């Protein structure tokens, strides 16, 4: 009988033999990789996108970000770079976010890829931090297996697109990261410590909603039955202290918004104002539940105001009351459900118009932090329902894939202003502001007729839209329709007498209609409002020149260059008139000052070169005219003038070469033909001499 030999095996390849700790670590790594992937993939379509919507104001034209003003002034400026104490300030104080823009600008300047990469990284970090908080809450409330599914939903939810794909939305991302990190710290330590306070401050200095971290922490303590009176008092004191300091930064003043920003806030009836607010709250909730028709701007007719009880939307308070009653009923059954609801509601409070008026009616970006509570809520509901549905996993995967697809498409729409505004028009065709924005983009791209059509639509939807009146008037003026332009611009300044740009544009239209008295009055009205407008002074100078007041024209242009040394049109016109008045010595005297400000302005070089030639400084003249040609190689005038200069210097071959370039650019140029003929006759005469 054969004996069977059994060999001892020192290890096993069976994954089932792994310890629970190893399994947990492996699953944790898998979950993290899935969340990182899902946070990045939907937003790949926005990489390399332009600066769109309010990016120009918060980044490109922000003097702190672009380095025109010292970085230390970040603490005295609002989010848009204006002085926080100014009456025109938006009163949004977010120095942490602005500092990250400053760093981006230092590294990438106006190349947008780096900005978008940072935003996507921030969204990924926010998702991972949310996952960490969710795992902690699972243990506190004994309600397991919700953190991962909630975090997946958070990673791919389409309502986050504005916060992630729009670079300016970084304020929401940073605020949420610091807020959730503070909550993680609080859940772990229970007591208030320096790290928690620092994270709350960083969150608040990223965006004002961050202050709501403290009430959320209080709710966690209360629902987890671990609150004590002393800790509660410290929390309230911290909330009051940070809130007081934040209001002190604003000088205890609220931002001043217009009816265009938030129409509901300007309703005369407090009753209907409250009804409209409740509808707006429900609409935000609707965007979380059904994120299908997303829009970058919901103002100006997109959501019409409720002004009668016959409007079904007037039932919004009843619906909210019903939801609250249902929530109260479930609070004892599931504390995690209650916390999720409170987390969403509390973090939304700063945008609710309850405590102060905000500068929008509906905004998707403000839902970034509140959506964390919503995602937890969805995970809890899904877990409860999955018990009763066999194919719950298939349905959830299908839903996630649909959300990824929607987010990917939506983030692609944020890539350019044209695609963004076009998508907005399909959702809110009655929004005058979208028509206005689309008109502006089309006009900037040279599509004048399409731009005019959108401006007319904006004015039709809102006849008092003075900015649309101004832009359309300006566009029509450029196309030669000064009469219609004058009519539109006159309406704009009637609607807003302090509209300096419209007064200036009205003056230009009146000047082109030869209404010089009215034009001068309009331009001076503009300067009364904005005395340091170099462009308005330039146009006033043009008016003086047309009415044969050369000295006053030169004075206006000199003032323009004093205010803005880089105003090239003023330098050019000033030099032309000085040359015309035989004052070339002044042109030469001012040339260094001009070229130090506008070194790459071809017309300035040309005029300086012309004056040097008149003073027989041929070498200097040649250098400046050549510089002008280098900057504008296709200018017939520049090549012709260089040919004339060479002819005066008896450098006939070089003169002939310049005239032939002129004729190649403009075959009918009479001056070049005549001068070339003279050169040929001269050469022929010289060749016949003995």
Swiss-Prot record:
Cytoplasmic side: 1-32, 132-138, 188-234, 295-307, 363-365
Region (Disordered): 1-24
GO molecular function annotations of the record: dolichyl-phosphate-mannose-protein mannosyltransferase activity; mannosyltransferase activity
Record-linked InterPro entries: O-mannosyl-transferase_TMTC (IPR052346), TMTC_DUF1736 (IPR013618), TPR-like_helical_dom_sf (IPR011990), TPR_rpt (IPR019734)
Keyword Glycoprotein among UniProt keywords: yes
Enzyme Commission numbers on file: 2.4.1.109
Annotated TM spans: 33-53, 111-131, 139-159, 167-187, 235-255, 274-294, 308-328, 342-362, 366-386
Membrane topology value: Multi-pass membrane protein
Chemical reaction(s) catalysed: a di-trans,poly-cis-dolichyl beta-D-mannosyl phosphate + L-seryl-[protein] = 3-O-(alpha-D-mannosyl)-L-seryl-[protein] + a di-trans,poly-cis-dolichyl phosphate + H(+); a di-trans,poly-cis-dolichyl beta-D-mannosyl phosphate + L-threonyl-[protein] = 3-O-(alpha-D-mannosyl)-L-threonyl-[protein] + a di-trans,poly-cis-dolichyl phosphate + H(+)
Compositional bias ranges of the Basic and acidic residues kind: 15-24
The protein's enzyme class: transferase
Pathway: Protein modification; protein glycosylation
Localization, UniProt: Membrane; Endoplasmic reticulum
Stretches forming TPR repeats: 398-431, 432-465, 466-499, 500-533, 534-567, 602-635, 636-669
Residues bearing glycans: 166, 559, 600, 617, 686
Topological domains, Extracellular: 54-110, 160-166, 256-273, 329-341, 387-690
Gene Ontology cellular component terms for the protein in this record: endoplasmic reticulum; membrane
SMART domains: TPR
Main location per the UniProt record: membrane
UniProt keywords, alphabetically: Endoplasmic reticulum, Glycoprotein, Membrane, Repeat, TPR repeat, Transferase, Transmembrane, Transmembrane helix
GO BP terms: endoplasmic reticulum unfolded protein response; protein O-linked mannosylation
Top-level taxon of the source organism: Eukaryota
Physiological role: Transfers mannosyl residues to the hydroxyl group of serine or threonine residues.
Family (UniProt): Belongs to the TMTC family.
Protein name: Protein O-mannosyl-transferase F38B6.6
Taxonomic lineage from the root: Eukaryota, Metazoa, Ecdysozoa, Nematoda, Chromadorea
